[in-house]
């Protein structure tokens, strides 16, 4: 990691349909090999399914899902005198959002439905209702932090 120059933050353009910057980040995370139109089709298709199944605004469901998946605390390894401790630390806001997006997509890809549209919509609905693998991942992270609470004084 360079000490001299840090990478400058690029401006992310809000998506065309809902005008949401976080949704654009979500699409960019879903995207493979630069195929943005495919990622858009997947996300918008999933949102249409969410709207028809839940009879709710898909953006609200998406925000609720992200809030339910975002971790407040995580463990980081810290080496002290030959021993490695898992030290619980708070998660910065940007990293919270990035982890929530990453975990939602991983959980959706790990589901058994036929298409990615169906998998993503099911995972979004589950996460919005505090169920599903993405929420389980957050719970596991919090459990690890709670178990290693004794090492919190090693925080840096």
UniProtKB/Swiss-Prot annotation:
One Pfam short name: Ribosomal_S7
One Gene Ontology cellular component annotation held by this UniProt entry: small ribosomal subunit
Record NCBIfam families: rpsG_bact (TIGR01029)
Cited HAMAP family: Ribosomal_uS7_B
Top-level lineage group: Bacteria
Record organism: Methylorubrum populi (strain ATCC BAA-705 / NCIMB 13946 / BJ001) (Methylobacterium populi)
Entries under InterPro entries matching the protein: Ribosomal_uS7, Ribosomal_uS7_bac/org-type, Ribosomal_uS7_CS, Ribosomal_uS7_dom, Ribosomal_uS7_dom_sf
Summary of subunit composition and partner proteins: Part of the 30S ribosomal subunit. Contacts proteins S9 and S11.
Task of the protein: One of the primary rRNA binding proteins, it binds directly to 16S rRNA where it nucleates assembly of the head domain of the 30S subunit. Is located at the subunit interface close to the decoding center, probably blocks exit of the E-site tRNA.
Coiled coil region boundaries: none
Keyword annotations: Ribonucleoprotein, Ribosomal protein, RNA-binding, rRNA-binding, tRNA-binding
SUPFAM superfamilies found in the cross-reference section: Ribosomal protein S7
Gene: rpsG
A GO biological-process term: translation
Database matches in CDD domains: uS7_Bacteria (cd14869)
Entry protein name: Small ribosomal subunit protein uS7
Protein family membership: Belongs to the universal ribosomal protein uS7 family.
GO terms, molecular function: rRNA binding; structural constituent of ribosome; tRNA binding
Gene3D superfamilies noted in UniProt: Ribosomal protein S7 domain
């Amino acid at each position: 990691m360079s000490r001299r120059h840090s990478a400058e933050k690029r401006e992310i353009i809000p998506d065309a349909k809902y005008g949401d910057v976080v949704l654009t980040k979500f699409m960019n995370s879903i995207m493979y090999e630069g195929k943005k139109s495919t990622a858009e089709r997947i996300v918008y298709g999933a949102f249409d399914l969410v709207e028809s199944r839940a009879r709710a605004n898909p953006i609200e469901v998406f925000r609720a899902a992200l809030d339910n998946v975002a971790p407040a605390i995580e463990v980081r390894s810290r080496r002290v005198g030959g021993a490695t401790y898992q030290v619980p630390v708070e998660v910065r806001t940007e990293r919270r959002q990035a982890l929530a997006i990453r975990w939602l997509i991983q959980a959706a890809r790990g589901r058994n439905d036929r298409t990615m549209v169906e998998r993503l919509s099911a995972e979004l609905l589950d996460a919005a209702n505090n169920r599903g693998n993405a929420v389980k991942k957050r719970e596991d992270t919090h459990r690890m932090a709670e178990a290693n609470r004794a090492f919190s004084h090693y925080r840096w």
